[in-house]
Amino acid sequence: GVGCFENNQSLKEVTLPQGLKTIPNYAFAWDYNLEGDLVIPSTVTEIGCSAFYETGIRSVTIGDGNDEIQIFSNAFSHCANLKWADLSNRVRAIYEEAFGYDPILAWVRIADGNVSLDAIQGFAFCYDQNLEAILLPTKTGEIWYSAFGWCPNLKEVYYASSQENYNSYVRVSRANNDCYFNATLHYNSQGPDEWPSTVFSGWVTIKTNSYWYENDVLQ
């Protein structure tokens, strides 16, 4: 249920079983010692609000499948060690701040499939200061205000289909999405041959706090 493993500092890894349908709100929130590569089974259709908020996971991979999945608000926000996200071919919606304030997140892949990505909501990837590349599926719909706000290193946007389809499907708010519009848009692409390096060294500021990373490890 809600908050089932919330604020559990003894939890260091988790294996989610095939057949699981829902990850509840706050399920693993504030589990700072939860680390490693998180795999979400292909049967999961909802990742609840703040489900993995402020955890130490290194990556997230969602299994491909036929059942659409929704990623709710703050599901993976403030994850200081999250380096990349492979979100499958079945994402219906990414809600507000779902991946916001992830300081070393380097790339995001949303594969092409039969599901329409109805919306990337406001602030979904805000303040992802190391985000360099994202792949969007053909049936991407609305990209809301500030969805990519304060992502100064966003350089490449890959789109799975043609420019004609992009113009037909995709509607991007002009409000605080300059980083998105300044990136290079690649049509008919499944992403780069090699995704950006996830190794990061430097200072990262999250709201009023500053953090030093050495070779992508928070010091």
In which residue ranges do the predicted regions lie?
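Short, conserved catalytic or adaptor-binding loops enriched in Gly and charged residues
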Residues: 172-184
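Extracellular/luminal Pro/Thr/Ser-rich low-complexity repeat and linker "mucin-like" segments
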Residues: 94, 120, 143, 208-215
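Amphipathic alpha-helical interaction segments
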Residues: 8, 174-175, 189, 219
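Structural signature of tandem-repeat unit edges
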Residues: 8-22, 32-46, 55-70, 80-93, ...
